[in-house]
């Protein structure tokens, strides 16, 4: 009997202790902490995820601006670090919680050529074009023209990156067979200076920090990319000048190249679905508050955005199309 009472007493003490610990560990909403019941968004508040770029890149800063400006009682935006345009598309298609993605505009052409079974044009639409990024191709002094790179090592950046995607399309389109390498840009720059590779490709808005510290003593120069009819289907013409890179481009010259657009893409949901309505609400909020993104506190690339810009080969998200039709005067 005493043993039974002892066991009961022990169990009682143990349960009391566990209950006390649970209460002590439970978040107290009155002190500003969230309980399980309050962690969920309030009814009617849409939560959307945007997959962007690397932690130090422009894409994630653009996504963070959207999260800051549009956050409110009806909308919350989660900006997520991404791993390049190709992976961002895969995340948009298959990763739970990803409603939109910032990608390069040539990603559709890349998938058509290399993953034709995906038929992305039927699955992905664009809310708006954001801004242009320039294709930089820097080489050693031994390389005079783009054609001279045939058979030589050219760094395409890491696999799956936007640069790798654009470089692959460019050399394929121009029918110049090079030997791609896939080092990160910092490593590739050291190998370029050491003569281990002949050129380095990089897609980024000019001027980019990767080239700003180069000097004449490094014996490197930009290669010109001629804007051929085949490139016109996917890219825009662009130039690099002494104003962009004073140590690499003579004051009286310009280097011709191409530019690729950064795009805010969304899955092409059925217009009657709840997922479509969520993205449609975001689109309306983005467009209505667009002038706030052009303020000095936001990334300067916002001032290059035209909501009405058309992207060849892409289908505009229906809610964006409807908003533009009802707003004749567009920024």
Predicted regions and their residues:
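Bacterial N-terminal signal peptides that target proteins for export
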Residues: 1-13
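N-terminal hydrophobic or amphipathic helices and topogenic motifs
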Residues: 14, 22-81, 120-123, 287-331
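Extracytoplasmic
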Residues: 45, 57, 74, 84-87, ...
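Bilobed "Venus flytrap"/periplasmic-binding protein-like clamshell domains
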Residues: 45-70, 77, 133-190, 194
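Pocket-flanking alpha-helical
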Residues: 63, 67-68, 79-119, 189-191, ...
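Pocket-lining segment of extracytoplasmic ligand-binding domains
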Residues: 105-106, 115, 176-274
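Ligand-binding clefts/hinges and TM-proximal coupling segments of bilobed small-molecule sensing domains
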Residues: 159-170, 238-310
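An extracytoplasmic/periplasmic, membrane-proximal ligand-sensing/linker region
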Residues: 187, 193-194, 204-218, 222, ...
